[in-house]
């Protein structure tokens, strides 16, 4: 639900609706979430946005934006007519994103925001096992539709500032000298200075943690971004594999990368 997706959000929603109709037809349970940093979870007595803490900050713990939320847009738990009404309502909102004069129809908190993709992957560690348990599933498919990478996360770090008497807990950037450790699995992953490699590391971690979940990413992009996307995923532009994928994209307007 990021601002950069305004021009492609309608196509993204159409792709999502195709998935929903298929799941509904063959009776596959589903939940649909939209990531956002714009949804007000709570307000102060004066009416200002007052986000509640998502967790207790601790030194060396990955930091999650306090404004991060997941909006549960759709669920298979509702009846068919109710789901259709919800889909119509969301589609009306999406249509207004490209029309400046229609922005008044957007409900509070439903406007486009940043791209908290990495925060979402962290949250999936809780969402997916709960979903799998509720529906008694052996296998789960998790489909993520986005138009780009999220910003790298930081971690909490307590420092003593010269002008203050008490220690201050701030945030430190994660670089190649850092290791991500999953306290449940005990596995560690070396980080990198390349901001676009942060998401693949988080995906590797959650794939190791949840082996019965199949992760599928659907990336919506302009034609001019395809080559850059392939290179960002470690495909050398001088290799035959890269050239073949570019030829395939020109024919079909789509390309697949297997991890």
Question: Would you name each region that the model predicts?
Answer:
Residues 1-259:
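Acidic, glycine-rich A-domain
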